[in-house]
Amino acid sequence: MDLEVDIVKNKKIDVQKAIKMTYKENKRSSLVIYLILRFLVIICMILQILRGDLNNALLCLLSLILLFAPLFIQNKLEITLPNDLEIAIYLFIFSAEILGEIDNFFGIIPYWDIILHTINGFLATAVGFSLVDLLNKNSKNINLSPFYLCLVAFCFSMTIGVLWEFFEYSCDKFLNVDMQKDTVIQKISSVALNPDGENKAVVVDDIGKTIIYDTNGDVLQVIDNGYLDIGLNDTIEDLFVNFIGAIVFSCFAFLDLKHNRSNSFINRFVPTKANNKLIKSI
């Protein structure tokens, strides 16, 4: 038993050394990006604390944890993230949490949210693409069709997208934030407005203004130019662009697998097991 424990410990140490060697030889750029972004997030967190904005300070803390996640995952799961994928993950986290939420790029820059969700769909598909290999590391012979493998990766990406929308909805409901961005619309259709209680939608078009009253009849808010959709359009839009990102990667992956391309575009974004050659050489 002691011998088995020692073997496992030595294997973990070898994997850690292999990962460190990989960073020194092939992934210096991702390490530099990580250190720069971590420094910027720490500066941002200090500024938020000085301003008394604890919510943004906690968001910075969350960003630091997320930035560390790729390093932790590689060490824990004994895998190697491609340099391009790792850099993309770091930039995605910084763009979403710091630039998007704290610096309000979601409100200032048009389509910022759409761009990030599209990238998320692409990257999540890359991770899903590698899951079959990573979760079946004890199976030496796995012969799956390219279509099936791409389908699994696509479904994984869409599942991540749906879970993220669940997270946004929960934050909006319980923390009174607005992660599911609202949209002013001029047309609604609802069976709740049917005076006879029938299952027939009543269409209200050309809405010019919405006035919100409290229970005492006092005006709380006036919404000009329409009616607030409470995040539905944003949710569907996010899922749709996630779908597009997942489809794009799946198509590239299918073509590469079909034509047996070893040095392909998708390999720059697909995690693999820790390099056995490096481990043996240590």
Task: Describe the predicted segments one by one.
Residues 22-36:
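N-terminal membrane topogenic signal
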Residues 263-282:
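Short, highly charged, low-complexity non-transmembrane loops/tails of multi-pass membrane proteins
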Residues 39-44, 91-101, 158-162:
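Aromatic-anchored segments of alpha-helical transmembrane domains
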